[in-house]
A protein has these predicted regions:
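Glycine-rich, basic loop-to-helix element that forms the pyrophosphate-binding segment
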Residues: 92-110, 343-350
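Short, flexible, basic/aromatic active-site loop/helix in glycosyltransferases
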Residues: 163-191
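Conserved nucleotide-sugar donor-binding
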Residues: 111-112, 195-209, 354-355
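N-proximal low-complexity "stem/linker" segments adjacent to membrane-targeting elements
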Residues: 1-55, 270-304
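Acidic donor-binding loop at a coil-to-helix junction in glycosyltransferase catalytic cores
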Residues: 219-225
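Conserved donor NDP-sugar-binding/catalytic core segment of glycosyltransferases
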Residues: 127-169, 365-377
């Protein structure tokens, strides 16, 4: 384990950089002065939106550095947005559930340095924005997630007070935050603990990773996919338990079994082609995006030795091997194979962006049976 005394944060023109996921090195450091855009995806939720806007008016964050973008997913009537904070409404055509596209539309209209995503049915406590934006204000690649609690806000008509009935928080998520020390000990599976309903990052980092994937057109999954892509791009993940917002109604675990099962099955199907985590790919089928992208240089090989090297990589499962070099095509052509995992040429950045691991191989290497398991840690 790294000794904390031997690591430190350091300043760059873009902000503070920390080694690994060590956001704890900035404990006690005040936020930088940034402007914040709260992006609220919305569809026919006027009463809930009104509660959200009223709660945003009560934030202890400076109003002159705060704006709200309501991203309407094609509601029949436009939302009413009476608020003491500047509010912009952007609208897209109603083509079904497109929360990912709505969030991107809202982000595109935002002018703030930091994007704070907040669902229209999730009402923040007064310190929410201040707490959630602190790390992104300091670390340019921070991705923070707040604490989403649950209550029947429609019945209460306000945020809960002591003695009010509450709904359960998802135990699996609370356990994950406890085990990981609020994601300080994040790993390749921590994307599952980032929720777009209470999520925050720098505008520049959001643009760098490409925003939400708009192929998601049903409930759930787009936040996990974005968090996975951000992690692969070097994001610093942090759960901020003091950034509390209240969801109006139960978590999915508290909803009818059939609805929950159908939604989770659809989410899993949408994630598997894009997230290469083996736990997200349990059905034995192969996807276009591999977990490992390997580049093997043909220089110094014969056709036979090249095949031995490539074959030793392919035995490791979810792998695509690119063979490059002047003789790559002729060598591979002699093998007589019909294997879509083997390609001739060099991968583009887009080809490798979603893979967890990239391997470059020169010379006549032969990989043992456990080599890639060791690589994956």
């Amino acid at each position: 384990m790294t000794d904390a005394r031997n690591v430190a944060a350091w300043r760059t023109p873009q902000g503070t950089t920390v080694p690994g996921n060590r956001w704890d090195l900035l404990d006690g450091v005040d936020a930088a002065a940034v402007s914040v855009s709260v992006v609220v995806p919305y569809y026919r939720q006027q009463n809930q939106l009104s509660m959200v806007l009223a709660a945003l008016e009560r934030q202890d964050f400076p109003r002159d550095r705060l704006e709200v973008i309501v991203a309407d997913d094609g509601s029949p009537e436009p939302p009413q947005v009476e608020c003491g904070i500047p509010v912009t409404v952007v609208t897209q055509e109603d083509r079904g559930f497109r929360a990912a596209a709505a969030r991107n539309l809202g982000a595109a209209a935002a002018t703030g340095d930091v994007l704070c995503f907040l669902d229209a049915d999730t009402v923040p406590e007064p310190g929410y924005v201040r707490a959630l934006v602190r790390l992104p204000s300091l670390i340019p690649d921070a991705l923070t997630v707040g604490r989403r609690r649950h209550a029947d806000l429609t019945a209460l008509g306000r945020l809960p007070e002591p003695g009010d009935p509450l709904l359960d928080e998802p135990g699996w998520l609370l356990d994950a935050y406890e085990r990981s020390r609020d994601l300080l000990d994040a790993d390749d599976r921590s994307y599952r603990h980032v929720i777009s309903a209470v999520m925050c990052c720098r505008r520049t980092f959001f643009d760098e990773v490409g925003g939400f994937d708009e192929s998601f057109t049903s409930y759930g999954g787009e936040d996990w996919e974005l968090a996975n892509r951000a992690w692969l791009a070097g994001a610093v993940l942090a759960h901020v338990p003091t950034a509390v917002a209240w969801h109006d109604g139960p978590d999915w675990a508290g909803r009818p079994d059939d609805r929950r099962r159908d939604a989770k099955n659809g989410e899993a199907m949408a994630l598997a082609p894009l997230v290469t985590d083996p736990a997200a790919r349990r059905h034995g089928v192969r996807y276009a995006v591999p977990d490992v992208t390997a580049v093997v240089h043909s220089e110094g090989h014969t056709a036979a030795s090249l095949m031995v090297t490539v074959g030793s990589i392919l035995r490791h499962g979810d792998v695509t091997v690119w063979v490059d070099g002047a003789e790559a095509s002729s060598f591979v052509g002699t093998w007589g194979i019909d294997d879509p995992r083997v390609r001739v040429g060099s991968p583009t950045a887009a080809d490798t962006a979603r893979s967890r691991f990239a391997v470059e191989v020169g010379g006549r290497a032969v990989f043992g049976e456990t080599a890639f398991e060791l690589l994956a840690g």
